[in-house]
UniProtKB/Swiss-Prot annotation:
The protein's name: Polyubiquitin
Keywords: Cytoplasm, Isopeptide bond, Nucleus, Repeat, Ubl conjugation
Name of the encoding gene: ubi4
Protein's cellular compartments: Cytoplasm; Nucleus
Domain annotation Ubiquitin-like: ranges: 1-76, 77-152, 153-228, 229-304, 305-380
Role noted for this protein: Ubiquitin exists either covalently attached to another protein, or free (unanchored). When covalently bound, it is conjugated to target proteins via an isopeptide bond either as a monomer (monoubiquitin), a polymer linked via different Lys residues of the ubiquitin (polyubiquitin chains) or a linear polymer linked via the initiator Met of the ubiquitin (linear polyubiquitin chains).
Length: 381
């Protein structure tokens, strides 16, 4: 039968083989055709490196299957070069190769002149005269290739998810042009993009130079969701987080978005709007939270405390609370545990009825304090 062997240079060799041929036999046939010694050949099929003593049938290699031939350089190694388009190039190199040499190999493969190439490894741009070993680049390391456009420049666009996109632009490009480039890379229609630089939203007809956007500037991309809206979340440190949400999102959903951005577990988040703590199962529209509303994020520090609530029947409930919890919050926790609606609860501590908007610390309620719960019967006064 015939099989094909594809080399890293893209050349395809055709071989006549039997299913019972060993990988050794195949390497000998390649040596006969191409002059490459078997000990410098690695054959790959279906992502697996083939072992010399095994046969083609062991690997289920059938007629017209294609094997990939990778050269094992004496003292050499393979590295990968990833381009901005996501394409990965494989190169055969030596540790002693200079960055210049590597750029020449990329030119041989891709036709990109070395003076338009910038190579990045571990966040550093590599200098032409240095060697791979100078940068501790080892076998199967991945370099990133960025193109240096003549007369152009690179800028960065950071999305709300934290992803950074690199764009090749000219100072004379309009914001429209930039949005088109983002669409090419990310598939986001221009009419759903808002670009922010130095706190200003950029207008479509203006140019990068109008906004003094220079090389390696970072723009921020905010999505304009159809039917969605943006809200802001302000932390106690004064930092403001921007979130893309829907009115139908639950407070749970919002906390998950904050976790995605800031890494704070939902169970440590308390969200406050218009002076009220927001409950997980309710939606933004339940609280009349509209576009560009600002919520306040308070962290629930581990290191809360327990208090007890004693009912008239003599039952004692244990609650996990914070000193900063409002009486409202406490009543919600009692509802969660006992099913009693907050408007039917009266809480008494040290002979005083507790008011909903006040906090436990306002009443000097400390760990292991006992509150008394009295029910307000419907129709009662």
């Amino acid at each position: 039968m015939q099989i094909f062997v594809k080399t890293l240079t893209g050349k395809t060799i055709t071989l006549e083989v039997e299913s019972s041929d060993t990988i050794d036999n195949v390497k000998s046939k390649i040596q006969d055709k191409e002059g490459i010694p078997p000990d410098q050949q690695r054959l790959i099929f279906a992502g697996k490196q083939l072992e010399d003593g095994r046969t083609l049938s062991d690997y289920n290699i059938q007629k017209e299957s294609t094997l990939h031939l990778v050269l094992r350089l004496r003292g050499g190694m393979q590295i990968f070069v990833k381009t901005l388009t996501g394409k990965t190039i494989t190169l055969e190199v030596e540790s002693s190769d200079t960055i210049d040499n590597v750029k020449s190999k990329i030119q041989d493969k891709e036709g990109i002149p070395p003076d338009q190439q910038r190579l990045i490894f571990a966040g550093k741009q590599l200098e032409d005269g240095r060697t791979l070993s100078d940068y501790n680049i080892q076998k199967e390391s991945t370099l990133h290739l960025v193109l240096r456009l003549r007369g152009g420049m690179q800028i960065f666009v950071k999305t709300l998810t934290g992803k950074t996109i690199t764009l090749e632009v000219e100072s004379s490009d309009t914001i429209d042009n930039v949005k088109s480039k983002i669409q090419d890379k990310e598939g986001i229609p221009p009419d759903q993009q808002r670009l922010i630089f130095a706190g200003k939203q950029l207008e479509d007809g203006r140019t990068l130079s109008d906004y003094n956007i220079q090389k390696e500037s970072t723009l921020h991309l905010v999505l304009r969701l159809r039917g969605g809206m943006q809200i802001f979340v302000k932390t106690l440190t004064g930092k403001t987080i921007t979130l893309e949400v829907e009115s139908s999102d639950t407070i749970d959903n919002v906390k998950s978005k904050i976790q995605d951005k800031e890494g704070i577990p939902p169970d440590q988040q308390r969200l406050i709007f218009a002076g009220k703590q927001l409950e997980d199962g309710r939606t933004l529209s339940d609280y009349n939270i509209q576009k560009e509303s600002t919520l306040h994020l308070v962290l629930r520090l581990r290191g809360g405390m327990q208090i007890f609530v004693k009912t008239l029947t003599g039952k004692t409930i244990t609650l996990e609370v914070e000193s900063s919890d409002t009486i409202d919050n406490v009543k919600s926790k009692i509802q969660d545990k006992e099913g009693i609606p907050p408007d039917q609860q009266r809480l008494i501590f040290a002979g005083k009825q507790l008011e909903d908007g006040r906090t436990l610390s306002d009443y000097n309620i400390q760990k292991e304090s006992t509150l008394h719960l009295v029910l307000r019967l419907r129709g009662g006064i």
